[in-house]
Amino acid sequence: MRLLSSLKLFIIVVLLSPTVYAQDSGFKLPTDQLKFGVFIAQFDPGGTFKMQGERWPPLNGNWKTTGDEIALTMSGGAGGCSGPGRYKLSKDGSKIRFDLVSDECEIRRIIIDRSSWSLASEVKTIPERTIKTSAGERSPAKKAASTSKGSWPSFRGPEASGVADGQNLPDRWDPKTGENILWRTEIPGLAHSSPVVWGNQVFVTSAISSDPKATFRPGLYGDGDASKDRSKQRWMLFALDKRTGKILWQKQAYEGEPLEKRHIKSTYANSTPTTDGRIVVAWFGSEGVYAYDMQGHLLWKVDIGRIDLGAYDIPTYEWGPASSPIIWNNQVILQCDTQADSFLLALDGSTGKTIWKTKREEIPSWGTPTVAKTATGPQLVTNASNYIRAYDPKNGQELWRLGGSSKITAPTPVFADNVFVVVSGRAPERPIFVVRPEARGDVTLPEGKKTSDAIVWSMTGRGSYMPTPLVYQGMLYVLANNGLFDAYDLKTGKEIYRQRLPLVGSGFSSSPVAADGKIYLSNEDGEMLVITAGEKFAHLSTNSMGELLMATPALSDGVMYVRSVSSLFAIGRKSQK
């Protein structure tokens, strides 16, 4: 059961090129070795097959095709499978696809059902993805404005820091009584995307389902299942007046049935929008990238192809994207780590045309990239499974890479106090890395080493799975999904404290933010905790929002904007209104 439980975490799809087929009485299978994620298979023309994958027991046996079906039997009942399994074969574009007809063997069914196989010799060949750009209602936008005071332009704010001092936020608030609630506006649909702020506008995205019962499943669990919701969606971008909560405009970017599935804990609008005060950009995965001016006029839209993400070695699980776009120097930058065709992409913010595109040998990841100003120049840093990487954002050229991450990565890199902090939280690795921006080349640590010229310090077993870490006032805070909250000295890595947070409930997906010596934490059940920053843990208050919380708050001009499952709240002292 432990093996089967661990199987519910992975996915990869790879491409297939034409080859010579074996002669048999049914569907023609390739004679060469095939690859599917971490699995290698050989279907011998004589009727035997071998299938093996990293950390999996080998599956060997006999095969026979009849028409468009294949029957598989295991030698000696290997893997506890004595009966045959039957699968329908089809061409999936340039791939060979297996779809379940009947099979009582669970391990075989998990591996094979809905799988698409490629020639092993062709897996490293990454094809060009077609990117289609369309002009919108207006001519290209003006030159971008400089960062506005009080802006929170992307996920976790400037440089993904999550910090905005000078807010004078309250410690306590109550939506039921209205205490320190400036306004609350209902937002239709489902979304885990976070709010962003520029000037007097707050932007949020959503996906409105045609099924009124569409939902997601919060909580701490290991299931990797995709949601059964494939209902027709309307992907939306909303602009609200940040002073009153009034919806200023709303735009439908796309309508239709989703091209990809989503995780049962996910939505079809996970990616946070981004803005530079000139344009606001929303990315809806396979449904496209959309850029609007600040009045809601569509400037351009780009189809970057299928964005297929999921568990890295069980391709039947589709989880959907969560990485968010960022804007740097009029470039819209996207991190697209998918099943077979991973890349970084920089689009012209004025036209949507490709400025540069860098291919990546990566499995799916969900973190948002970060661009930071360093003493050695700007760096674009990405968190992913094979390597943490830094690039020159001007041209997409790689500057350095660091191995040792978890197989599933979601937190966003953070730049603070002249170091990059990058973590990931899937066992067994769960690393924390603190990296100097002067790093160049491959700076992967040799086994057993924790530091180097490039790595200030590192550790394993303490990285967070979903929440992005927080660097504040010389300390690093790491929040685990299960409510363990760790504090470290940023310079040395010394543990200051480890605290089990109260009211863990369904767990934590939202990332912590900080202002004026206080840290704000949101659990999925809708409880917001306020604690003091510093070497001593002190819990100041717990504030119930009465609704599920998955998104990360935004801070701007004395107000904290909190996105719940159904609403957007503005929290601040009444004098801020």
Predicted regions and their residues:
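Lipid interaction determinants
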Residues: 21-140, 144, 243
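Noncatalytic, solvent-exposed loop/strand surfaces
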Residues: 24, 78-80, 86, 114-117, ...
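Bacterial N-terminal signal peptides
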Residues: 8-19
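Positively charged n-region of N-terminal signal peptides that target proteins for export
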Residues: 1-8
